[in-house]
Amino acid sequence: EYYTNNLGNTLTLVDVMRNHGCKDIIFSSSATVYGDPDSLPLTEESPKKPATNPYGWTKWMIEQILTDLHTADPEWNVVLLRYFNPIGAHPSGLMGEDPKGIPNNLLPYVAQVAIGKRECVHVFGDDYNTPDGRDYIHVCDLATGHAAALNWMNGRTGVEIFNLGTGKGTSVLEIIKAFSRACGKDLPYQIDPRRPGDVDANYADCSKAKREMGWEAKYTIDDMCRDSWNWQCKNPNGYEG
């Protein structure tokens, strides 16, 4: 399904764009292309590594497809935005993440524990070599990152890569504590075995985005948890509720 949705639809989109003379594209890529990093923080020059899942492979491949597209036709203007871990919701509470079934992503799961739909948060492993965790970024910061990229790319051609993150790693336990502050109660959690493929830490160097586009993340982990909790309270059963 990832291959059909991501690869197939991207090829269709590029073909339509080419037929209509539109050669400017911003691609929502992912930090998954870096794999298990050799060193931190991750810069845009950090090596790409083989993906560990189909989602990561599609991002890896689409980056290559768009790079090849520019090589074949230098008039193309391609910006690859490598997201780290988008979380949060719009501060109004009108827009948020509404997973179907059991959430695969951390923050919606934590929010459902806080609202009483799940028993506890599962923390996979407490034996990491570093307390640092993943780089979480507020969805509103991603939106301003896209706006900054649109302004930056105007009149240019080429292929450019930008990391979008906060530059700080946050552990799952730190997320749980921050969400507990947001909802006003201690959230239950249990330590489970570490999952294969989980990395010790993964966070960005976003200095290039600040230097080139004038962009940097504004929201903190507490802001992300507050806005996610606000959305969950206004939509306890999701949009269909």
Tell me the role of every PLM-derived stretch.
Residues 4-12, 19, 23-24, 33-85, ...:
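Catalytic helix-loop patch of NAD(P)-dependent Rossmann-fold dehydrogenases
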Residues 11-16, 141-144:
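Conserved mid-core alpha-helix of short-chain dehydrogenase/reductase
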Residues 21-25, 75-77, 119-120, 156-160:
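Active-site loop of short-chain dehydrogenase/reductase
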Residues 30:
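Residue(s) in the substrate-gating loop at a strand-loop-helix junction
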Residues 52, 87-103, 126-140, 168:
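Glycine-rich "substrate-gating" loop/helix at the edge of Rossmann-like oxidoreductase active sites
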Residues 93-121:
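Mobile, glycine-enriched helix-loop/loop "lid" segments at the mouths of ligand-binding/catalytic clefts
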Residues 112-241:
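C-terminal substrate-binding subdomain of Rossmann-fold SDR/epimerase-dehydratase oxidoreductases
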